[in-house]
From Swiss-Prot:
InterPro entries, sorted: D1/D2, Photo_II_D1/D2_sf, Photo_RC_L/M, Photo_RC_L/M_CS, PSII_D1
Protein name per Swiss-Prot or TrEMBL: Photosystem II protein D1 2
Gene: psbA2
One MF annotation (Gene Ontology) recorded for this entry: chlorophyll binding
Entry's Gene Ontology cellular component terms: photosystem II; plasma membrane-derived thylakoid membrane
Free-text function comment from the UniProt entry: Photosystem II (PSII) is a light-driven water:plastoquinone oxidoreductase that uses light energy to abstract electrons from H(2)O, generating O(2) and a proton gradient subsequently used for ATP formation. It consists of a core antenna complex that captures photons, and an electron transfer chain that converts photonic excitation into a charge separation. The D1/D2 (PsbA/PsbD) reaction center heterodimer binds P680, the primary electron donor of PSII as well as several subsequent electron acceptors.
UniProt-annotated site: Stabilizes free radical intermediate, residues: H190
Binding site for chlorophyll a PD1: H198
């Protein structure tokens, strides 16, 4: 008879839990950031789905005129949204237990705060989890750094902007048409299109899309032939193979002749760093711009029209933008005030006749 003697495990439940959380052998890495990320994102997602489907109207402007955003109250997928918290709540922290009843909490838009704050904690932890997994695997930390761009953008529109404006009611609604409404109102009140940081963000996003398409098409066009005409070219690559799957010299030569020599990268590492850095830096600047405009340091304005020697207005594109901004501002919160602030606070300026 054979007797097998095993050493009894001396680790307790907590040590086993710690080992499981930080193990890179799991199908999905949990990590310490994941311990907080998972419940917060599940909470935000669950509340969003319920609110998008059935939340009652919210008194967003604090003037007893509720706005419906859910599907069961007459909206569709395009027009539906989770409406931001009421202006009557302002920046006050408004959990369920701060309201006198659940009906009051829903009427004042409590679900918006619950969703946004849990969502932000969740995406912060997701970024930390990216860094944590990179650290465990001995990788460099740039994946988390790149992800910081959309995290900064989300933080700017959901947290920094409401803080600067003094109320969560100014945050971005959680829906398709609500997002576009937020963009139009932001342009009307802050002239974001004329802010240099937003312009850098546009260059980052559009430039990143252009560079991604250029890189992908160049690589695909210079693949090393490994298959016949009857086979898919994708079969010519084996996961983990040591040799390069495309000819970077050919791609470099093509692009160098198409534009000029120094427009083409001859170093694969610097090329991919550039592809990552360009859109990330652009989105960083946009998030910074929104955070600046949150405190009303707005984009360039040209409110003083150009006039000739007889006092007649010489129409410019700036006048067109100004009138468009005023029109959008008049439509915004039309029952909360009679005039946009810049119409009510200054003397009537000459307008372009069109």
């Amino acid at each position: 008879m054979t007797t097998v003697i095993q050493r009894r495990s001396t680790s307790n439940v907590w040590e086993q839990f710690c080992e499981w959380v930080t193990s890179t052998d799991n199908r999905l890495y949990i990590g310490w950031f994941g311990v907080l990320m998972i419940p917060t994102l599940l909470t935000a997602t669950t509340c969003f789905i319920i609110a998008f489907i059935g939340a009652p109207p919210v008194d967003i402007d604090g003037i007893r005129e509720p706005v419906s955003g859910s599907l069961l109250y007459g909206n569709n997928i395009i027009s539906g949204a989770v409406v931001p918290s009421s202006a009557a709540i302002g920046l006050h922290f408004y959990p369920i237990w701060e309201a006198a009843s659940l009906d009051e909490w829903l009427y004042n838009g409590g679900p918006y705060q619950l969703i946004v704050l849990h969502f932000l904690i969740g995406v912060f932890c997701y970024m930390g989890r990216e860094w944590e997994l990179s650290y465990r695997l001995g990788m460099r930390p740039w994946i988390a750094v790149a992800y910081s761009a959309p995290v900064a953008a989300a933080t700017a529109v959901f947290l920094i902007y409401p803080i600067g404006q003094g109320s969560f009611s100014d945050g971005m609604p959680l829906g398709i048409s609500g997002t576009f409404n937020f963009m139009l109102v932001f342009q009307a009140e802050h002239n974001i299109l004329m802010h240099p940081f937003h312009q850098l963000g546009v260059a980052g996003v559009f430039g990143g899309a252009l560079f991604s398409a250029m890189h992908g098409s160049l690589v695909t066009s210079s693949l090393i032939r490994e298959t016949s005409e009857e086979e898919s070219q994708n079969l010519g690559y084996k996961f983990g193979q040591e040799e390069e799957t495309y000819n970077i010299v050919a791609a470099h030569g093509y692009f160098g002749r198409l534009i000029f020599q120094y427009a083409s990268f001859n170093n694969s590492r610097s090329l991919h760093f550039f592809l990552a850095a360009w859109p990330v830096i652009g989105i960083w600047f946009t998030a910074l711009g929104i955070s600046i405009m949150a405190f009303n340091l707005n984009g360039f304005n040209f409110n003083q029209s150009i006039v000739d020697s007889n006092g007649r207005v010489v129409g410019t594109w700036a006048d067109v933008l100004n009138r468009a901004n005023l029109g959008m501002e008049v439509m915004h919160e039309r029952n909360a005030h009679n005039f946009p602030l810049d119409l009510a606070a200054v003397e009537v300026a000459p307008a372009v006749r069109g």
